[in-house]
Each structure stands twice: as structure tokens, then as C-alpha cells.
Amino acid sequence: LRFDSKQWSGRVDSISRSLLQWYRNQGRDLPWRNSQDPYCIWVSEIMLQQTQVERVKEYFHNFLLRFPTVFELAKAEEAVVLKYWEGLGYYRRARQLHLAAKKIVSDYDGKFPQDVRALQQLPGIGRYTAGAIASIAFDLPEPILEANSRRVLARLIHFDSPLSGGKSEQPLWDVAASLVPRDGGAGAFNQALMDLGSLICRPVSPFCNECSLVDHCQAYQLGNVDRIPYMPKQKSTQKLEEKAYVLVHEGKLLVVRRQPGEWWEGLWDFPRTIPENMAVRGPQRHQGVISYSVTHHKITCQVLSKMISQRPAVRRHQRWL
């Protein structure tokens, strides 16, 4: 399916006006919208990747208090950045945020590039995030496409092909590019599109009778709102079992640093196997069971404790607490 821009050329102004009027009255009041500082916008967008808005609200303010500028973030130790990210999950985002801050300082003297291609060269910044920064911070007419706006646009043009990322979404990028205002207000338009998707054009039971774009929505007119967008089936949940060892010596507990390629790389955790440099003694005690999820994995972890007969010299990735 290709998007025919000529078909929509006469509707662009009407769609933009209707959406922006709704946004002025009904848009969400979010803390990162009180600024056009590209640093604040960038931090919020990275936090919002795969994390609910309400959760991000809890962390955004404290993160900016600790790292108020890109310079402060760039010079911080990675461990400190990860500590302030703790609880948001997907820690790779924090590492890439830190790396990008260093690059912005070293390559751009701390000033964010305004070109989307240059923005996409920074760690952790893809097409959507680059468009969000460019449009919201610099009011450049750059389109965005994320979960909420994708749903609005798919219903708007009755896009019934499977959405699996990449080239499959190009028609929706074309729609977004055709609609974003060229003469100012691009940031407000993009945020309005996201808010409409979050508040009105919901995945299930959307409030079509309250939607400012209902007169233009082909999915609504064809009675297919509930089945668009068409999303491929998600991966089935995989069940995993593991053991975590609480190794004790004279009141101290051993923790190990997660290695590259492991979940939570760089974070400290109880070992999942008994390290070969540890000599254990006495019985093994069962302390309980913890269940948690990582991506599409559901994990059951047995927590076991053992005493260490003597405390050996720790290796670089080990620590007694």
C-alpha cells in the first residue's frame, strides 16, 4: 500500500486545524512540555521509549536535578547514571544516553545538532526520536511515528497491512510527513498527534465520538476501527528457571557485575552460579522464589543461600557487601 499524497492534499489544513484546536483544549500537561530545551526533550523521549508516561514522570524531575545539562551528564560516571535510571528498566537506554551526551559535548560543543540525519548518528537516537527533538525543540517540519501516532494515522488512511517496523511503516511516515505543518507549529502538531492516540484513539474501545479527526477517518467510515492497525502476533512468552545464590562470609554478601551480553549489563546482582574461586561449606538453604519478566521471558528464580568457608581475593567483577 502506497500513500497517495494528492488524495489528501485538500484535507491537510483541515486536519491540522482540528487537531491543534483539540490539543490546545485537551492536550496532556506533561513536565517536559514546559521547555523547548533539546536536552530536556531528548531525555524525556529516551525515557518514554517502552515506558509508560506516568512512570517517566516519577523519574524525569530527579534525573534533571542530578544532571541538569548535557555537560553534567557527559562527565558523570556510568554507574551514577545507571543509579538514577534504576527502576525505569531497559538500561541500555541509559548507557546510550550517556554515550550520546559525551558525543554531543565532544563533537558539537554541547549544542544539539538540528539536522535529523546528524541526530540519528548519536547513540540511541532513531528516526522517531530525531524527529521529536527537531520538531519540538527547533520547530522543524519533521514527522514522527511512535505507537500512538502510528495508530491514529493507520486508522486515518485505513492502513490494513501488517505493521512490523521498517519498510512496512513507510506509508505512515509519508502520511505524517504530508501532515506536519511547514510554517510553524510542527512540535505542537506532533505532540497533539501522540496525545490524540493516547487519550482518544486508543487501541481498544476508542472514543471515536470525541475525536477531532473523525470526519477524515477512513477506518471509522468503513467500520473497521477495532481491527486497525493490524499488528503481527507477538512472540509467545518463554518460561525460564534459574537460581540465584546468596553467598555469605562473616556477614558479607557476594555480588557480581553482569557481563556484556547479559541482561542488565554492568549492574550488580547475586551470582546465578557459584563462582569457581569460592569454597562453600555447610547445607544449602532455600530462601524463597522470585518471579519476574524480561521482554517476552517469564522467569522463576529460586533463591538459595550458602556459607563460604574462606574469603578469597575477589575478581574485578565481584564485590563483598
Model-predicted regions and their roles:
Residues 1-28, 34, 198-321:
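Intrinsically disordered, low-complexity, charged terminal extensions of DNA damage-control enzymes
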Residues 2-4, 8-11, 17-209, 213-226:
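Catalytic cores of DNA base-excision repair glycosylases
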